[in-house]
Amino acid sequence: KSNPDKRVLNLTRSGYASSQKFGTVLWSGDIFASWDTMKKQIHEGLNMCMSGMPYWTLDIGGFFTVNENWQHRGCSCSKDPTPKWFWRGDYEEGVEDYGYRELYVRWFEQGVFLPMFRSHGTDTPREVWNFGRPGEPFYDALVKNIELRYRLMPYIYSNAARIWTDDYTMMRSLLFDFAQDKRAAALGDEYMFGDSLLVCPVT
């Protein structure tokens, strides 16, 4: 209230009714790297946005990638040999695993069409240059998606203005825009990003 002209951002993994008025961006917390987890993120994001939280995001690629070898990844819990329930990723070699690279690229593609585009995690590098070199498929796909996100910024900014002026949400269930279409009601793995882009992530 003392700085009404300031735009705030509060990135948090939890919130409460009406916390969106305080610049809250919710994210799904420290998730682990698996195809199933990535698919579930679509439902989680739609549920949050339908609950009135217009800004939602996730850890692209999963926060945790490994399962067995977490003690060697430099976390502060490395001296405790007790298995950690949360360290459940499917990729012991992290970015060196081509399976993880494919998952990461697909998750990255989904992230382009979220209110906040955010790659974050522990136990493996996530910078683009760790996924190959120019001319190689994983690297090139990531670069193209970064460029696409930048091209979408005027559209994203316009939709952000609608959140303020019209109580809008960027990540939209198909029920919002196609309420009369019974097929749309049955689709939980697609969503609208604003009013012009239909998104169906590869999961």
Language-model features, listed with the residues they occupy:
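Catalytic-domain carbohydrate-binding cleft regions of carbohydrate-active enzymes
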Residues: K1-T203
